[in-house]
């Protein structure tokens, strides 16, 4: 029977069918608390465990100031993102690059946002591969007493990746809600273990709070790298519009209400995780703290094993949160631009290849601390600290020297400093660590 639909209607129906298949737009029935634990899972992760180490590189005064300032600035820029999601009546900017295209034009917006967002999301997935593998390795070390065969870190990263070869086939954000909730609970749990176990261990006899580096250059470079560690700890902006896209919206009840409620709850949890871990961890261990606080804690063994296991569960959820927008980008390109059919086979191939790629890079370059500093400044600073402000200024055009104009420009200047300085320190740290590194060890 011939179709009675006009070509335009047929095209529209085809477009809707594709949107219903793509991960970001396929399900819009999320509750406000979904946004809370998705944001906690996206934000609290490997970054919190490096904060005492960052404090050791920054020192008490600058460290506390930067932690608080970052919390305030990123909450403000996250509010901007939530507000701009439905700034055009009848339209939703479901993806970060769609907002960028509205602000800067179709092509320029794509070129500005997509490379940065991909660097962030792929970078996070790689770092979390390393984090998951290292935490599993630590569990093995603590539980397996002599005589015990040494197992390479590479194999633990592979074990961690094997979970994602399964979970990555969940179709959308709402489908991974259970994984994300478990991850959010784990983040609060291992953060509590990290600071409470530090308190139990007490202030170390030889504790020192001065800068660890022997040279002025070393101190400066470590300071720069620590800025990236802090930036890495506030990374949720890269997926916030994609998370908000899952919440239902009507003109009477726009999605920004429940989304903002979830963000506020998430930021309270972030504060409860970050500040105690950063301050107590540094207070107890001083400048000898490891780049992952759990590595500084050896006893009680059962508690540290539990904390590392919680980290594994959490970064499983975090990996999925950051991988979902990447899956969406790749699948959109293949289906809309290259005219592939939206099938399960396509999804199976794309997602398995992505997991395999991040696993391979993680195995090859497992420099945890340096990776945080490098990715933190190079990619997170733009998308988290100042790109939302630039988009806000481009669209709303607040009056020059007004409060909104001044706040946004302050955020832009601070974000630019972070973007320029942090990768320098992070790259130096990677180079120093790589001197003693054997590939696939």
Could you describe each region identified by the protein language model?
Residues 6, 27-29, 33, 79, ...:
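Membrane-interfacial loop- and helix-cap regions that link adjacent transmembrane helices
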Residues 1-50, 74-79, 93:
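Membrane-interface "cap" regions at the ends of multi-pass membrane proteins
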Residues 51-59, 173-174, 370:
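Short, hydrophobic transmembrane alpha-helix segments
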Residues 54, 166-169, 361-366:
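Hydrophobic alpha-helical transmembrane segments
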Residues 46, 71-80, 160-169, 388:
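Central hydrophobic cores of alpha-helical transmembrane segments in multi-pass inner-membrane proteins
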Residues 62-63, 175, 258-261:
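Residue-level recognition of membrane-helix boundary sites in multi-pass small-molecule transporters
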Residues 169-175, 181:
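Intramembrane alpha-helical segments
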Residues 54-90:
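Extracellular loop-to-transmembrane helix junctions
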């Amino acid at each position: 029977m011939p179709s009675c639909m006009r070509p335009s209607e047929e095209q529209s129906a085809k477009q809707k069918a594709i949107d219903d298949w793509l991960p970001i737009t396929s399900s819009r029935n999320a509750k406000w608390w979904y946004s809370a634990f998705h944001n906690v899972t996206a934000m609290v992760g490997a970054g919190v465990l490096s904060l005492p180490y960052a404090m050791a590189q920054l020192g008490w005064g600058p460290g506390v100031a930067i932690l608080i300032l970052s919390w305030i600035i990123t909450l403000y820029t996250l509010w901007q993102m939530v507000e701009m999601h439905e700034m055009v009546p009848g339209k939703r900017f479901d993806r970060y690059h769609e907002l960028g295209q509205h602000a800067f034009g179709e092509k320029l917006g794509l070129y500005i946002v997509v490379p940065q967002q991909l660097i962030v999301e792929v970078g996070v997935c790689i770092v979390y591969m390393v984090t998951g593998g290292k935490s599993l390795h630590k569990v093995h070390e603590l539980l397996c007493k002599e005589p015990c065969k040494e197992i390479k870190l590479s194999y633990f990263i592979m074990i961690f990746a094997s979970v994602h070869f399964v979970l990555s086939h969940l179709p959308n954000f709402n489908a991974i809600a259970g994984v994300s909730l478990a991850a959010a609970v784990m983040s609060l749990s291992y953060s509590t273990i990290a600071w409470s176990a530090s308190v139990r261990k007490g202030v170390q006899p030889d504790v020192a709070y001065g800068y660890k580096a022997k040279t002025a250059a070393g101190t400066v470079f470590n300071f720069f790298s620590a800025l990236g560690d802090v930036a890495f700890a506030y990374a949720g902006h890269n997926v916030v519009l994609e998370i908000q896209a899952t919440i239902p919206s009507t003109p009477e009840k726009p999605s920004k209400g429940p989304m903002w409620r979830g963000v506020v709850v998430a930021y309270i949890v972030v504060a409860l995780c970050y500040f105690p871990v950063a301050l107590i961890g540094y207070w107890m261990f001083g400048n000898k703290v490891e780049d992952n606080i759990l590595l500084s804690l050896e006893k009680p063994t059962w508690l540290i094993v539990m904390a590392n296991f919680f980290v594994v569960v959490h970064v499983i959820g975090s990996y999925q949160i950051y991988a979902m927008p990447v899956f969406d980008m790749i699948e959109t390109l293949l289906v809309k631009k290259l005219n592939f059919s939206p099938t399960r086979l396509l999804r199976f191939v794309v997602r398995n290849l992505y997991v395999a790629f991040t696993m391979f890079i993680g195995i090859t370059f497992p420099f945890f601390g340096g990776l945080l500093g490098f990715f933190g400044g190079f990619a997170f600073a733009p998308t988290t600290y100042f790109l939302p402000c630039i988009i806000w200024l481009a669209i709303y055009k607040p009056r020059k020297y007004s409060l909104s104009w001044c706040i946004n420009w302050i955020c832009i200047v601070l974000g630019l400093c972070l973007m320029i300085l942090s990768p320098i320190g992070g790259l130096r740290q990677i180079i120093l660590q790589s001197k003693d590194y054997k590939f696939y060890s």
